[in-house]
Structure formats: structure tokens, C-alpha cells
Amino acid sequence: MSKAFTRENEDADDVEDEDSPSLPALPAGTKNYITPAGYQRLKSEYLHLLNDERPALVQTVSWAASNGDRSENGDYIYGKKRLREIDRRLRFLAKRLENSQVVDPAQRGECEQVFFGATVKICHGDGVERTYSIVGDDEANASKGHI
């Protein structure tokens, strides 16, 4: 049998430098400032993956493994790959939640300063007004005005 198009190490996907390539890792000892809504979104994603998606996938992979030949079993191969992705995301979320410091902008009240969690209106010279919210890395989305 030819080994031309097979991987030498099936677990090659497990070894990665980062848990999530979408955001850089925080430097050691750095707090991850986040709004209460952002913290809740991260926590709900973590709990959904841990309690719903992962157990269902483990059951599917178990069933696929019991069908015999794993080398040509699409359900098994895809399931294992997806399981690695979920585990990677769970590790990333756990680190982010552990290093999070929730900052509630409502406790600051009205003031004339820009601070974390503030919503700022900017008026350009041509009269166009834009609204931006100052948020942490996990919530940043320039298209929605979250910077």
C-alpha cells in the first residue's frame, strides 16, 4: 500500500503554538479587561461547548470508532478533528476567563473622560456623527463600533 498521501503523525493537529489564532495570547500577569456582557458571552460559549457540544461529539466519535476500520471512517476522522478544535477553544476560553477582570462602565456614571467601557460619540467636520464603545480584546469589532 502506498503511503504517499497519508500523514505520518495522526496527532499533528494537536501540537500548536497558540490555543486560538484569532487573538494573541496575553502577556504573563496581564489582566483581560472585559465588560459584564462580554464576560457573560465568553462564559456561555465555554459552558455550551463543555456541556452540550463536546459530550454529543464524544458520543458520535465513540459510535464511529465502534464501526471498525478508523482509517477510512469519515465520521470518526471528522469527529476527532472537531473534538481537537473544541478542546483547543475550551483551553483558550478557560485562560481568558481566568485572567478576566470585569469592569462595569455603569459604575462610573456620567463623566467627560474616555475610559474602558465608555461609549463615545465623535462628530467629524462634515457633520457625520459616529458612536464607538471602548472594549477589551475579546469584544473588539470595528464594524460594530466596538474598539
Model regions and ranges:
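Helix-rich terminal scaffold detector
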Residues: M1-R91
